[in-house]
Amino acid sequence: MMLGPEGGEGFVVKLRGLPWSCSVEDVQNFLSDCTIHDGVAGVHFIYTREGRQSGEAFVELESEDDVKLALKKDRESMGHRYIEVFKSHRTEMDWVLKHSGPNSADTANDGFVRLRGLPFGCTKEEIIQFFSGLEIVPNGITLPVDPEGKITGEAFVQFASQELAEKALGKHKERIGHRYIEVFKSSQEEVRSYSDPPLKFMSVQRPGPYDRPGTARRYIGIVKQAGLERMRSGAYSAGYGGYEEYSGLSDGYGFTTDLFGRDLSYCLSGMYDHRYGDGEFTVQSTTGHCVHMRGLPYKATENDIYNFFSPLNPVRVHIEIGPDGRVTGEADVEFATHEEAVAAMSKDRANMQHRYIELFLNSTTGASNGAYSSQMMQGMGVSTQSTYSGLESQSVSGCYGAGYGGQNSMGGYD
């Protein structure tokens, strides 16, 4: 375990492997033998660019003895996840917190959360009931609609304080009716982004799980025009269908997507190519470090995929949905660094339930535009040595072409 440098920079530890719905209280209970500096204010979660908890947090402690006690908790469990504990320092903590998450410094504490997966016809009253006991500001609920006036299955909620917003994150994966609701950290800036000019509809091609190259069915995807680089026959973006069974919106073609492009930000920075058959379409990832999965069980969920890669913590997961509304048995999993993506390849051919999963690396050492440099990752206890060295030279076209160019492609249908 790599320790941070000694010095007079406070008493800080970093936790990694936290459950996605982890709350401040969960961290306090995990470190119950330690005294946390300033109580709840001493726990700092690290968020991804989409406002989701990254599975990591910094905790400020009162003394060096508290740090030693915290380090003894390394590899102990919180729920079904085992937690790694690293020694850190204030400089590292401040740098990471400044460079992670969707929020700028002036909007980081404005009390917003984003909901995803709302039932069709969900009302503001139901959202208020969902957050019963947490004060929402007047007119603090925003329900975005698409250009046709249909609800998107998402909502923004502003609470009376950032502390209440943090508590609201504890409602992640609880139900409204029969739907599981996902709760993410958000900001006023993100709410404003939903009032951008309407996104354009663009027709692209995507091969079905059993189609041969060149015979892909046509379907409609929604993309941000600024993110398009090239388009030819046979192209598609893997970012179009990442909402699995919880999304509250269907586009009429059988797959679900965010009409305001939030998860399509997956396609808008950190370029890498996806190639299918004779065509190609340049799409982009937020980090540029992706692993493509093939052979997923029909009922596999995002949480199953996160658990599959544990103790690694993917930045996000996109389960692919075909134009017939069924999962394709494939997914794209994005990691914060090239090193983590390479480490994830050690799970190639491992089982998920009764299916073995094929993995394809889609990452290069120079592609990262994320917050963590190699040097910083070393300081945070992450090895920068490749653990799956033979895969780094795989070309994107090679690993993706294999998914559709052969006769042994594994779909997700059992």
Curated annotation (Swiss-Prot):
| Protein name per UniProt | Heterogeneous nuclear ribonucleoprotein F
Would the keyword Cell inner membrane turn up in this protein's UniProt record? Answer: no
Sites of the Glycyl lysine isopeptide (Lys-Gly) (interchain with G-Cter in SUMO2) crosslink = 87, 167, 185, 200, 224
Show the segment(s) annotated as Interaction with RNA. 81-86, 179-184, 355-360
Annotated SMART domains: RRM
- For the cross-link Glycyl lysine isopeptide (Lys-Gly) (interchain with G-Cter in SUMO), the position is 72
What the entry lists under InterPro entries is as follows:
ESRP, Nucleotide-bd_a/b_plait_sf, RBD_domain_sf, RRM_dom, Znf_CHHC
Indicate the quaternary assembly.
Answer: Identified in the spliceosome C complex. Interacts with AGO1, AGO2, TBP and TXNL4/DIM1.
Q: Which residues carry this modification: N-acetylmethionine?
A: 1-2
Please indicate which superkingdom the organism of origin belongs to: Eukaryota
